[in-house]
Every structure is written in C-alpha cells, then in structure tokens.
C-alpha cells in the first residue's frame, strides 16, 4: 500500500486542517489514538493543476512561466525550475494553484480567475474541476 500524501490532493486538503498536524503524526507513529477529533477550518478550497502541453505524454521543458507572483492564493511548484532568474517548466505537472473562500462555488470561481493570471505558452489546465460538486 501507499502511506504518503497524494499529490495534488494534499495541497487542497491541508489548508483546511485546523488540528495540529505534528500531534496527528506523533499519535499515528506511536500507535496512539488522537486525544481530540480532527478540527477543520470552515471554508472551502479548490486546486487547479497547471500542466505542460502534451502531459501525460511527451512534453517540452524550459517554457518561461510568468504571473505566478500575481496569484491571490497558494501556488505550489511541482515541475518547475529556475533558469537565468526566471521560473520555467521542468515537468508534466508544473504547479497547482489553490484558493480558499467561504463556499465551494466561490473558491472555484476565485481559483479559475487566479489561474488566468498565469502566463505560459506551454501550459494547460482543466476547466471542469469542481463543476459536478456545485451542481
């Protein structure tokens, strides 16, 4: 079995965790039960992966990415590199943009807006993320 965090699920779930993650890890490692139930922040999160065109098949590397610093949300780098002071693509799943808001619909709207700030000729993202959940 696989005993690690999933990617990109972790980047979306962990911002909502209110409980102390070290306490959780310690209890699990020591075989103890948690003293308190897990607590979660009362907001929703959405994450949209930015992937290299061609992923999961063949894709080019080295395309310059701009606008990451303009995103109002968290940007987790997955397949990026620094080249001559600029961020470039270096993998298939390049980054994930995660946004939070009071409702799932608002988080989805915000995330799609923020993803639009990222500029790179060699990136694509899915536009159906979260749609089924808000219908």
Question: Where are the language model's segments positioned?
Answer:
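General structural feature for long, well-ordered alpha-helical segments within catalytic domains
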Residues: 1, 9, 13, 17-21, ...
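Short secondary-structure transition/capping segments
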Residues: 19-32, 74, 81-87, 122-132
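Glycine-centered flexibility sites
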Residues: 6, 31, 54, 62, ...
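Active-site "cap" helix and flanking loop/linker of ATP-utilizing ligase/carboxylase catalytic domains
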Residues: 2-70, 83
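Generic long, charged, amphipathic alpha-helical segments
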Residues: 61-96
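Residues in well-ordered beta-strands of folded domains
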Residues: 2, 49, 66, 76-79, ...
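Generic C-terminus detector
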Residues: 83-84, 89-135
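Aromatic side chains
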Residues: 1, 5, 55, 76, ...
């Amino acid at each position: 079995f696989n005993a690690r965090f999933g990617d990109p699920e972790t980047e979306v779930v962990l911002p909502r965790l209110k409980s102390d993650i070290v306490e959780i890890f310690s209890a699990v490692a020591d075989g103890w039960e948690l003293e308190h139930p897990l607590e979660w922040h009362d907001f929703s999160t959405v994450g949209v992966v930015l992937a290299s065109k061609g992923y999961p098949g063949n894709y080019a590397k080295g395309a310059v990415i701009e606008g990451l610093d303009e995103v109002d949300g968290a940007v987790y780098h997955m397949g990026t590199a620094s080249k001559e002071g600029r961020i470039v693509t270096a993998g298939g799943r390049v980054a994930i943009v995660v946004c939070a808001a009071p409702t799932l619909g608002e988080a989805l709207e915000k995330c799609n807006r923020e993803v639009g700030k990222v500029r790179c000729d060699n990136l694509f993202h899915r536009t159906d993320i979260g749609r089924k959940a808000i219908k």
